[in-house]
Amino acid sequence: MTLLSKYYVPGLAIEDHSIDVPLAWSGHEPGQAFDGETIKLFYRVVTTPEHVHDDLPLLIFLQGGPGGEGPRLNSPTSDGWIEEATKHFRVILPDQRGAGRSSRVDTHTMARIAAAHEGDVAVGARAQADYLKKFLADSIVRDFEHLRLTEFGGRKWVTMGQSYGGFLTLTTLSLFPAGVIASFTTGGIPHVPACATEVYEHTFPRVIRKTAQFYERYPQDKERVAAIVEKLPTAAEVSEFVGKLTDSVLNPMAGTEVEH
């Protein structure tokens, strides 16, 4: 463990830490020594000043995303739950691998991987995909389990997951249930067993209802959207966020049969 800094903000005492974890967990177990390429896992430990030296139970926050960094706090009220949580817990706020102050994955990372396979686009793309697979939920929770075992003496902790953190919660409970006292989620519980088709079959009728409500409120937009859809097959307009616009982007339910 490397202690990077200790400081206070109004109402909170914060420590910044970093540890090494394997880039690839295959062949390694959390809590044990490892070799090969490593990456950095950054995390913060947060308490109130009056509890700095108290033996509080641990709560780890499983951030949303995917690829989300932990909350950046200026006070106990910076994030809605921190004020109450720090009354009872020592709160751990990790940045997931690939995000925040942990070893990042960004466009520069992907460009370096592609450059290593210059001249063979397909091989470069496969190498990029293989690298990104090392940043999935199973690796994220193995990082956290390694953190629990090596830096917190193997003490069991409470988990709280937000959005994608709900998916991390179930992954944690599947792989390392013995390390968890209790789990809370504020959203993002995946379907069990996983079936994306069934999830979207429940989603589409709601989208249809919401679209109808929108057009009731803004009826003039119905003609505008219809006019845009007519032009899309031959249009060259490009959206900053999604690339070339198509009717499937504007209307992702086009061609979908939904039971009302």
Residue ranges and their predicted role:
Residues 235-260:
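Alpha/beta-hydrolase fold active-site neighborhood
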Residues 1-8:
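N-terminal targeting or regulatory segments adjacent to alpha/beta-hydrolase or S9 domains
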Residues 8-239:
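Gly/Pro-rich cap/lid or specificity-loop segments adjacent to the active site
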